């Protein structure tokens, strides 16, 4: 895992088209902004895990 230090207002690049900007820090929470092309999915980990679980175990009638 690459670990980086950024201050509020600073940005990091992921590849050529994705940017992650630190918008604010309050206590133990960090607000970040992600700019990515529309074809790149961006999710919080807990949402991504729920999506993956739903793909593995679709509810009856939702297939």
From Swiss-Prot:
Belongs to the CsrA/RsmA family. It comes from Pseudoalteromonas translucida (strain TAC 125). GO terms for cellular component: cytosol. Pfam families: CsrA (PF02599). Coiled coil: none annotated. SUPFAM superfamilies: CsrA-like. One of its GO terms (molecular function) is mRNA 5'-UTR binding. This is Translational regulator CsrA. A key translational regulator that binds mRNA to regulate translation initiation and/or mRNA stability. Mediates global changes in gene expression, shifting from rapid growth to stress survival by linking envelope stress, the stringent response and the catabolite repression systems. Usually binds in the 5'-UTR; binding at or near the Shine-Dalgarno sequence prevents ribosome-binding, repressing translation, binding elsewhere in the 5'-UTR can activate translation and/or stabilize the mRNA. Its function is antagonized by small RNA(s). Keywords: Activator, Cytoplasm, Repressor, RNA-binding, Translation regulation. It is found in: Cytoplasm. GO terms for biological process: mRNA catabolic process; negative regulation of translational initiation; positive regulation of translational initiation; regulation of carbohydrate metabolic process. Homodimer; the beta-strands of each monomer intercalate to form a hydrophobic core, while the alpha-helices form wings that extend away from the core. It comes from the Bacteria.
């Amino acid at each position: 895992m690459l670990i980086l230090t950024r201050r509020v207002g600073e940005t990091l690049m992921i590849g050529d088209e994705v940017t992650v900007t630190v918008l604010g820090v309050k206590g133990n929470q960090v607000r970040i902004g992600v700019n990515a092309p529309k074809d790149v999915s961006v999710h919080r980990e807990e949402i991504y895990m729920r999506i993956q679980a739903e793909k593995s175990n679709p509810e009856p009638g939702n297939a």
